[in-house]
């Protein structure tokens, strides 16, 4: 049980054990509410759960702090967008990220990994480089549940694919003045593989430059690089 600490028992530690057991029981109950008879599950690098219109990633704790490559690209576009030079196959966002566990807030944070100058081990300039080339946080997710043996956490992913998430931001990366209609955007397909997962979403927008309502299909792939 990852919530329990080893050591000599005392009244204080017993209270901590009770709290840990309570938290673990709650997480298992929450997991059962998400992964039940109505849930469709795909096995892969992450488990992908679909319950009605909600989608979840079940991410193994062992994959925390490992490099993940996120590639977002267009898979279908309407004619008016194609005529403007925005075509199927365009990669509009590529990010190298790591998932981090913020235990205090019970959240998973996503950190964008940015390159920094290399320096020899023990070099005096190393501290300055580390402090001037930090990698920023992009977003965070509430942990909805842990699996039964607490080796993986579950996050809800619907909002990643509404076109306005920092890790799936369509229009700012293509310099188009518009925004996504979240109420008419959705996930349409998911697929889990051994070393990556793919999510296809349908985004709806009114593009001002073209004065038309446009329907776009985007594909998001996350790959484990380690």
Residue map of PLM features:
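Auxiliary tRNA-acceptor-end handling modules of aminoacyl-tRNA synthetases
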Residues: 2-219
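A short, hydrophobic C-terminal helix/tail in secreted or cell-surface proteins
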Residues: 220-226
